[in-house]
């Protein structure tokens, strides 16, 4: 007979040991024997359940964004430059508004410019603003 018994020692369950301690003890004892079943499988299930739970939240996010951002037709976009702050037409004109007929026309107009002969001009400063000259 060996000096030490092969049976592992397990302390007696007392009234002071709670249910959580007993469950944890059995979990730790069985984890080396079945690592995937007790650790990997619950982890994978939590990830899958989380993806199902977060799908409606992501859909809600994109639906709110779609309600906020609306696609304008080309005619509405052109009219944006002619409206005032309250929507009255003809009150203020946007100086940067240009009507571009066709992309090809714009391309050829830009290609016709002479980009080799240019002269650097200083921008006129406001009164009291330093001009940056030393």
From Swiss-Prot:
Membrane topology: Single-pass membrane protein
Main localization category: mitochondrion
Transit peptide (first-last residue): 1-12
Compartments, as annotated in UniProt: Mitochondrion inner membrane
Keywords: Membrane, Mitochondrion, Mitochondrion inner membrane, Transit peptide, Transmembrane, Transmembrane helix
Superkingdom, taxonomy of origin: Eukaryota
Any one of the GO CC terms: mitochondrial inner membrane
Any one GO biological process: mitochondrial cytochrome c oxidase assembly
Annotated transmembrane regions: 35-55
Function of the protein: Required for the assembly of the mitochondrial respiratory chain complex IV (CIV), also known as cytochrome c oxidase. May participate in merging the COX1 and COX2 assembly lines.
Family according to the record: Belongs to the COX16 family.
Protein name, UniProt field: Cytochrome c oxidase assembly protein cox16, mitochondrial
Organism: Aspergillus oryzae (strain ATCC 42149 / RIB 40)
Upper lineage: Eukaryota, Fungi, Dikarya, Ascomycota, Pezizomycotina
